[in-house]
Every structure is written in structure tokens, then in C-alpha cells.
From Swiss-Prot:
It comes from Thauera aromatica. This is Benzylsuccinate synthase beta subunit. InterPro entries: BSS-like_sf, BssB_TutG. Induction: Induced by toluene, probably via the TdiR/TdiS two-component regulatory system. Pfam families: BssB_TutG (PF18512). Signal peptide: none annotated. Pathway: Xenobiotic degradation; toluene degradation. GO terms for molecular function: benzylsuccinate synthase activity. Catalyzes the addition of fumarate to the methyl group of toluene, leading to the formation of benzylsuccinate. It comes from the Bacteria. The keyword Chloroplast does not apply.
Length: 74
């Protein structure tokens, strides 16, 4: 099963929903403009990480603002 185009992280100029504000984004400790998206899971429940090249201009349909809770990790 592959991700649909709407769930793919994509470039959107001047987006109101940047990855930087999304609870599923984990910042890169060495480069603040990059990060990882952890919203996708595979069939066994494991996290499928995606690299984000630019957290200010990238977005997807699964964007959620807020903080990631402990329950979201398990």
C-alpha cells in the first residue's frame, strides 16, 4: 500500500500549515530548517519516517498543530 498524493509531504509556497507547526514533525538537531515526519505507520504499526527538506514551506493533508503526546508514540 503506498501513500496517496495528499498524504505526501509537498512544497507549498506561503503555506498556512507548515511542517514546523505540525505535531508529527521532529526537528533535525543540526539543521533547524530540516526535520522528519512521523505521521505515517506501516501495517505492523511501526513508524515510517520521511525527511523534510524545508519545514517552513512543506505541508501535507495530515497536518495537526500541537504537541505529540506519549500515546501517539505507541
Amino acid at each position: 500500500m503506498s501513500a496517496t498524493p495528499h498524504t505526501q509531504v509537498h512544497w507549498e509556497e506561503n503555506t498556512a500549515r507548515p511542517c514546523r507547526k505540525c505535531k508529527w514533525q521532529t526537528p533535525d538537531p543540526t539543521d533547524p530548517l530540516r526535520g522528519q515526519c512521523t505521521v505515517n505507520r506501516h501495517a505492523m504499526g511501526g513508524v515510517w519516517k520521511r525527511w523534510i527538506r524545508d519545514v517552513e514551506h512543506m505541508t501535507c493533508s495530515r497536518h495537526e498543530e500541537g504537541e505529540l503526546s506519549f500515546r501517539d508514540h505507541v
